[in-house]
Design a protein with these regions (language model features):
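Rossmann-like NAD(P)(H) cofactor-binding subdomain of soluble oxidoreductases
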Residues: 55, 61-146, 162-164
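Generic structural signal for residues in well-ordered beta-strands
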Residues: 27, 59-61, 129, 173, ...
Length: 333
């Protein structure tokens, strides 16, 4: 029996995933904007978020959350982290019992420091909660470039069942049971992407980028393990894979923010010019607090936080990192 998918969120990644699942399952995508809904239904496009892209013709869009989720066998949450709770609470009365809920957002809730699957467990206990993550730049995947992702659920049987829903052509989806590690890998790497973007914007060079990526992976792995993730997860697609893609690509929103900061623009100006959320900007606040909570030293994240929220410059950030004493490679700094 083919599963029915209800996907909440009409941004670039939500639309891309909906177009993928529509090849394997009946899919309805919810978008807030009625014009977007009409465009998807009538022209099979979403020009605002996926310019020049043709969506799967069977994909249907709706501005009604109820219509999107009431018959769904799988709920996919494609909204930003800070909107996640509100949208899920709106959907809750209409979701059937025990339906799996899959998160696409790569962020943490500021007010609670919670991961998205923790929010699912709080609002909808009993529903299997998981995450689809990895080195997944939406536009590349939509246009058919080869890519790989991870579907993580605590129950491997559910992950395996969902694998076939998301896999399509050159988009290969692997399973994992480390939901904590997979979710944290996606959220934490965004801050490191801002750091590499800053270096690129300031013309710091390839060696600097490589150093930030490598030390950044070490940094996010330390916090991830302290919070319950498994070390091997951070060496895989959800950790290193996602980190390398996001830190190396001009298509990455978080890298873009860092790049523009490195060029001298203000954060306010950069955000006002973007039409989608760069999760790392808000996640940085949470990560600095989590680092204190878990007593984990995260020098790169600390310096990025100071640039974003304390008025430090890009040069201040790099000088700050150079003040850390150099020890063993396995140590912070």
């Amino acid at each position: 029996m083919k599963l029915k998918v209800g996907l909440l969120g009409g941004g670039s990644w939500g639309t891309t995933v909906a177009s993928l699942t529509a090849k394997n399952a009946e899919t309805i995508l919810w978008a807030r904007n009625q014009e977007t809904v009409n465009e998807i239904n009538e022209h099979h496009t979403n020009e605002k978020y996926l310019p020049n892209a043709k969506l799967t013709s069977s994909l249907r869009a709706s501005s009604s959350i109820k219509e999107t989720v009431e018959e769904a066998d799988v709920i996919v949450m494609g909204v930003p982290a800070q909107s996640f709770r509100k949208v899920l609470e709106e959907a809750k009365p209409h979701i059937r019992p025990w339906v799996p809920i899959v998160n696409l957002a790569k962020g943490l809730e500021i007010s609670t420091k919670m991961r998205m699957t923790e929010i699912v467990n709080e609002i909808m206990p009993g529903h299997p909660a998981g995450v689809l993550t990895g080195p997944n730049l939406a536009k590349e995947i939509h246009f058919g470039n080869a890519a790989a992702a991870v579907i993580a659920m605590v129950d491997k049987l559910i992950a395996t069942r969902l694998q076939s829903v998301f896999s399509s052509g050159l988009f290969r989806v692997y399973t994992n049971t480390d939901v904590i590690g997979c979710e944290l890998g996606g959220a934490l790497k965004n801050i490191i992407a801002i750091a590499t973007g800053m270096g690129d914007g300031a013309n710091a060079g390839d060696n600097t980028r490589a150093a930030i990526i490598t030390r950044g992976l070490s940094e996010l792995t330390r916090l991830g393990i302290a919070m319950g993730g498994k070390q091997r997860t951070f060496a895989g697609l959800a950790g290193m894979g996602d980190l390398v893609a996001t830190c190396s690509s001009s298509k990455s929103r978080n890298h873009h923010v860092g790049f523009q900061l490195g060029r001298g623009k203000s954060l306010e100006q950069i955000i006002n010019e973007m039409n989608e959320v760069a999760e790392g900007v808000k996640t940085a606040k949470v990560v600095v607090e989590l680092a204190k909570d878990y007593n984990v030293d995260m020098p790169i994240s600390q310096e990025i936080y100071k640039v974003l929220y304390e008025g430090n410059t890009v040069n201040d950030a790099f000088k700050g990192l150079l003040r850390y004493e150099v020890g063993s490679e396995k140590e912070p700094g």
